[in-house]
Amino acid sequence: ALSCQDDDFTQPVISFTASSASVNTQYQRRDQHLRSKDFFDVKSFPNITFQSTSLEPNHINGDFLMRGILGIRGIEHEMTVDVEYGGTMTDNEGQMRCGFSLYGKISRAAFGMTWNRPLACGGVLISDEVRLQGNMQFILKQ
């Protein structure tokens, strides 16, 4: 959901809730493991949440930096994501739409997801750093 206190989009609030069981890597065995207690523990923690706290212009590239609180497995941490504004348009039905792309990184261990497996050649199977990417489209509510 997106809400704004004003028409010029200077103070937007973005929040979302996603089902942790909706994880889909296109590989069923891996998805089942990701839904287990080793990772998302979807039976105990069915939702992933995000609530923005601020949106500021990114003077480096002209887009935005959004700060907010991400909740996974009942653990909340502040995070910052890069936001690219994709544009605004009126669709064929006369509805105003705007699009955004989001990019960020988190530590999965910070959210209690520490499972890993050592590799024979050294190192571990899974990186702690997880890159997040998402696309959003909003429709102006009349």
Language-model segments: residues:
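Low-complexity, acidic/polar, glycine-enriched regions of mature
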Residues: 1-142
